[in-house]
From Swiss-Prot:
Part of the 50S ribosomal subunit. Binds 23S rRNA and is also seen to make contacts with the A and possibly P site tRNAs. The keyword Acyltransferase does not apply. This is Large ribosomal subunit protein uL16.
Amino acid sequence: MLQPKKTKFRKQFKGRISGAAKGGFELNFGQFGLKCLEPERITARQIEAARRAITREMKRQGRVWIRVFPDLPVTAKPTEVRMGSGKGAPEYWAARVHPGRIMFEVDGVAEDIAREALRLGAAKLPVRTRVIQRIAD
């Protein structure tokens, strides 16, 4: 699964996901992409599950690009622990995704296969998405 090799600080504030994506909202690599339509935190496990679903449907042909990276440590305290005594330990990694952000791109396969692969990948994610296609020049 994806996670940073090294971070400056172990823990971060929760923060909010406000506004539309400021970058990463255009197709840069592939012909088809999966665009996020609502703000959400997506975990590294969800990204990996979506990637596996996409590559399995494409039968390992073509190419898949992951355009989001989980760089936010999400902390949790153990169950049945009293309140207080500091913030919990980092439990997993997540990525903040703004509306309009391209999360996955695919290329090198037919349109129907690409759309079906991205649809199956979208089923693994907790956000509403849309499959987009590069306009032929």
